[in-house]
């Protein structure tokens, strides 16, 4: 499927194809990738479309090669991306740490599958910690965006490119295998963000420009301390300006569901059904996982009686919820370790049970 999907009307497409086409519309100039299920359609789409548009496409020899090619392209100010999944993203952690230190605007699409290790190709959210905390060395953070619909695969791909270049920071679009393979109607439209001028720092050729050096090495402890202070001031700004979430029926809620990605779809349906039953249930869906909407959750903990985290893992986002709630009210976990998310019926039954306590 290499044809460019139309910008002007609604079309039915997979999450992976939606991401790839949105990246093309966003102006992605370079794609470097290595195939792995369940995200291989992204590379498939790019292999045809990027060459058709005379942009750079490389099917790399490994995941390590592909992410380091992205670093090289981004150091010139280019819009560059790669895509991968779980065990393969693990191989990219060193490069992500360097990208954070070098302040390079890389975009990584991570479509999660079962793990740890090779695992399997079923949907999972087991890489929440890997994305939000980081698997490389040092005190760095990445921007992490989490779509829950195929339309959001489009919208957040656009935002990923914009935020990566606006803040010169590695940015991850974190989806799961279910969303990558799901088909829904979407509208692409035009790229909605202003272009960011990367000319002041990029290695754009030596002719007629000042000398520039991009490096992660700091020769002294004092130099590294100052750099880290600068880096974390940027992270603080990102938290203040870019934290995003969807919130429904929380004003009077006794129980608040917190969920991201594909499980949030079932959580939303369950919340609506419980409202029809007279149960005071609300929902908060983080759209940015990093920065996490901790302040808003802390505010809701002043009025809610309980939170339930709905995830496809053994309980990872729940730790961030507990930190935000800070012991004010209980935080419970409803999960599946891997595979399909908890069903609407399971969520409703859990809400009923927790309402009786």
Label each PLM-derived region with a short phrase.
Residues 120-124, 227-243, 258-266, 286-293:
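A general structural motif
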Residues 123-176, 343:
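Conserved thiamine diphosphate
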């Amino acid at each position: 499927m290499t044809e460019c999907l139309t910008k002007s009307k609604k079309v039915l497409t997979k999450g992976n194809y939606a991401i790839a086409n949105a990246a093309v519309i966003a102006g992605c100039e370079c794609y470097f990738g290595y195939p792995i299920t369940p995200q291989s359609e992204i590379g498939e789409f790019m292999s045809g479309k990027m060459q058709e548009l005379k942009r750079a496409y490389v099917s790399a020899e490994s995941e390590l090669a592909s992410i380091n090619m992205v670093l090289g392209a981004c150091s010139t100010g280019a819009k560059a991306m790669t895509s991968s999944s779980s065990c393969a993203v693990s191989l990219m952690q060193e490069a992500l740490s360097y990208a954070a230190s070098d302040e390079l605007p890389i975009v990584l699409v991570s479509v999660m599958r079962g793990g740890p290790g090779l695992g399997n190709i079923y949907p999972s959210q087991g890489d929440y910690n890997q994305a939000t905390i980081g698997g490389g060395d040092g005190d760095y953070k990445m921007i992490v965006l989490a779509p829950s619909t195929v339309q959001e695969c489009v919208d957040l791909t656009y935002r990923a490119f914009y935020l990566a270049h606006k803040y010169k920071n590695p940015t991850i679009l974190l989806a799961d295998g279910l969303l990558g393979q799901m088909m829904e109607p979407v509208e692409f439209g035009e790229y909605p963000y202003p272009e960011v001028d990367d000319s002041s720092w990029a290695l754009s050729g030596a002719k007629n420009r000042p000398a520039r050096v991009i490096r992660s090495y700091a020769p002294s402890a004092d130099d590294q301390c100052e750099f880290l202070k600068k880096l974390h001031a940027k992270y603080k700004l990102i938290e203040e300006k870019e934290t995003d979430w969807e919130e429904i029926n929380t004003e009077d809620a006794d129980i608040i569901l917190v969920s991201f990605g594909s499980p949030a779809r079932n959580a939303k349906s369950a919340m609506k059904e419980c409202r029809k039953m007279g149960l005071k249930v609300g929902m908060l869906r983080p759209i940015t996982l990093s920065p996490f909407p901790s302040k808003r959750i802390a505010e809701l903990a002043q009025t809610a009686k309980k939170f339930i985290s709905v995830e496809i893992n053994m309980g990872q986002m729940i730790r961030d919820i507990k930190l935000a709630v800070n012991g004010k009210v209980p935080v419970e976990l409803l999960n599946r370790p891997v595979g399909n998310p908890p069903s609407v019926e399971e969520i409703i039954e859990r809400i009923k049970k927790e309402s009786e306590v």
